[in-house]
């Protein structure tokens, strides 16, 4: 069977159609490429917008703990951002022993690492970092210069406002091994309160603090158990970085989100 011969006009239409299709494909590829180039990256599922701090010693603390009754910063009945932290949280983040002392307790994945003997009113996934932007004179004076999100709303609406913290309630991703858990900042420490080079630096600076194996953050019992620390009230190396609200995945840490400000 002899195939019919296509006219030159038909061949021209086919050629133009193929060229147009090729151009559409090329444009789509270019658009996708530009989108990827301009989007934030992910490192182990965590946004890399903020620098990663590696191999930082974390200690465990909890609402109601009395670490040193003689020290101005030795009690977790209050925090630098909440003078009624114990009340705001709902009580001892653990249990009261026979001597009336607030103790920590092992947490279980089956209930999202929540406390077993009380019902928290605020997020049990909390931590501190050594930058106090409210009660430390240097921390407050420098916060608009050193805190990366200071120019964003709602923070930019509170310049000079000592009743509004840029640090309180900010999210942090904390990684130990292949496990990442999230928590909100609710206090400042350990031991240092204006260590901007470590907290906000981009060169993986070591903390100024030399106590507790140069600890660079305290984490709550919920974060301790979520990360699989070997023991309660333990010291363990972790990696951490700040995370924007929109980049926090659902998990037990989003069951209760703390929104209260300085009080």
Could you describe each region identified by the protein language model?
Residues 1-13:
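N-terminal secretory signal peptides that target proteins for export/translocation
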Residues 4-6, 29, 37-39:
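N-terminal cationic leader/targeting segments used for protein routing and processing
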Residues 39-263:
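Secreted/periplasmic proteins
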Residues 19-30:
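Bacterial N-terminal signal peptides
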């Amino acid at each position: 069977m002899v195939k019919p011969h296509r006219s030159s006009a038909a061949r021209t239409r086919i050629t133009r159609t193929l060229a147009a299709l090729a151009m559409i494909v090329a444009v789509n590829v270019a658009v996708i490429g530009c989108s990827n180039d301009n989007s934030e990256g992910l490192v182990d599922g965590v946004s890399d917008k903020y620098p990663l701090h590696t191999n930082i010693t974390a200690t465990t603390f909890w609402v109601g703990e009395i670490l040193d009754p003689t020290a101005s910063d030795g009690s977790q009945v209050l925090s630098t951002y909440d003078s009624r932290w114990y009340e705001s949280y709902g009580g001892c983040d653990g249990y009261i022993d026979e001597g009336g002392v607030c103790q920590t307790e092992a947490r279980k994945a089956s209930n999202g690492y929540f406390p077993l003997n009380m019902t928290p009113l605020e997020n049990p996934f909390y931590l501190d970092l050594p930058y106090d932007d409210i009660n430390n004179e240097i921390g407050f004076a420098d916060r608009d210069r050193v805190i990366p999100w200071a120019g964003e709303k709602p923070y930019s609406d509170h310049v000079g406002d000592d009743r509004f913290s840029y640090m309180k309630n900010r999210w942090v991703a904390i990684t130990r091994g292949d496990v990442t858990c999230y928590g909100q900042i609710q206090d400042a420490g350990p031991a240092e309160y204006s260590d901007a080079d470590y907290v906000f630096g981009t060169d993986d600076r070591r903390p100024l603090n030399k106590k507790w194996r140069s600890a660079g953050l305290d984490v709550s019992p919920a974060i301790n158990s979520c990360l699989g620390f070997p023991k309660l009230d333990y010291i363990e190396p972790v990696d951490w970085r700040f995370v924007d609200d929109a980049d926090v995945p659902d998990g037990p840490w989003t069951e209760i989100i703390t929104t209260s400000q300085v009080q």
